Regions:
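Structured C-terminal subdomain patch of bacterial secreted/periplasmic proteins
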Residues: 259-327
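Extracytoplasmic substrate-binding proteins
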Residues: 145-211, 296, 308-327
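A short, structured surface patch at a secondary-structure boundary
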Residues: 73-120
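A local structural motif
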Residues: 48, 61-66, 101-109, 231-242
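Proline-aspartate-enriched helix->loop->beta-strand connector
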Residues: 125-131, 147, 253, 257-261
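Alpha-helical, coiled-coil/dimerization segments enriched in small aliphatic residues
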Residues: 95-100, 216-245
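Bacterial Sec-exported substrate-binding components of ABC uptake systems
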Residues: 2-4, 13-74, 177-205, 268-273, ...
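Short helix-initiation/N-cap motifs at beta->coil->alpha
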Residues: 55-57, 110-117, 240-249
Length: 327
């Protein structure tokens, strides 16, 4: 009997040990996975459908991506051309050769730079009109037809004004990245010219030749980018700032004796050339200057400097001309 009882006790102990081991081996209950986030990603802000543009003649509300664009300012036309933005109407009468494609019949002729054809422009129902100094007097009348923005460059703050105008176009047409890239290239060239202009023998006089007469331009003038942005030292700092420049004599040029003489030929640009600027400038008096003696009379392309300017194409070309002219 005792033996039987001992055997039963051993069997019970063994069963208890097995149950205990199985309990120990059982995996612990897994920790619940964190619930998936239900927060939606932040929505990208919608692009504005209208911009309020501040300019020299006021403020103008313009819808973004305007389809029918009328352009009087050739500098702005070359910016639009560079960015691949189509226009509807252009003042075709004085187009510079590098913008000759806009003489095509697919572009409406909107009058001359001084006399807009208001009736024709109104019939086009434009979404945007871009003007500059030659159309100042027509601003109010054009504004009755469509949103009108003044995009002429302020000569006293040339690069800031040019940059602002370029960025306005970038925002209006969704071309910000392209505008920034072009501006970066231009600024790199400016740095290169600044380094050249730092030399002590680079004093310059800027002139315009028209009808056999010569006028001078200095800092703050329409051609003052040479001094104000490119840092070329003026041969005379106190030149009258006016649209048509300060009337000067050939004796004046000899007196100032510039190391560089920059010349813009107005008559070539407007098609009234009887004599070239070179024939007028390179006379016996001017031949006494350092500029002539050292081969540093630089004839600038009036299509950029006189007819247009202030655009992505023209400003780059203007700076490049000065860069090549400085030795």
């Amino acid at each position: 009997m005792l033996v039987c009882m001992l055997m039963l006790a051993l069997v019970a102990a063994a069963c208890g040990s097995t149950a205990s081991n199985e309990t120990a081996k059982a995996p612990a209950a897994s920790t619940p996975a964190p619930a998936a986030s239900t927060t939606a990603p932040a929505a990208t802000p919608a692009a504005p459908t209208e911009l309020t543009i501040k300019h020299q003649l006021g403020e103008t509300k313009v819808k973004t991506n305007p389809k029918k664009v009328v352009v009087f300012d050739y500098g702005m036309l070359d910016t639009l051309d560079k960015l691949g933005i189509e226009v509807t109407g252009v003042a075709q009468s004085s187009l510079p050769p590098y913008l000759a494609k806009y003489k095509d019949a697919k572009y409406k002729n909107i009058g001359t730079l001084q006399e807009p054809d208001f009736e024709k422009i109104s019939a086009m129902s434009p979404d945007l009109i871009l003007i500059s100094g030659r159309q100042n007097a027509s601003y109010a009348e054009l504004s009755k037809i469509a949103p009108t923005v003044f995009v002429g460059v302020d000569a006293k703050r040339y690069m800031d004004s040019f940059t602002e105008n370029s960025k306005i176009i970038g925002k209006l047409f969704g071309k910000e990245a392209a505008v920034d890239a072009e501006l970066a290239k231009i600024n790199e060239t400016i740095k290169k010219v600044n380094a050249k202009a730092a030399a002590p023998d680079k004093k310059a006089l800027i002139t315009l030749v028209s009808g056999g007469k010569v006028t001078a331009y200095g800092p703050g003038s329409r051609f003052g980018i040479i001094h104000d942005v490119l840092n070329v030292v003026p041969a005379e700092k106190n030149i009258e700032v006016s649209t048509h420049g300060q009337s000067i004599s050939f004796e004046y040029i000899v007196e100032k004796n510039p190391d560089y003489l920059f010349v813009v030929d107005r008559e070539t640009a407007v098609g009234e050339s009887k004599t070239t600027a070179k024939q007028v400038i390179e006379n016996e008096l001017v031949k006494k200057t350092n500029a002539y003696k050292n081969g540093n009379i630089v004839y600038l392309d009036a299509n950029y400097w006189y007819l247009s300017g202030g655009g992505l194409i023209s400003v780059a070309a203007m700076i490049d001309e000065v860069d090549k002219g400085l030795k």
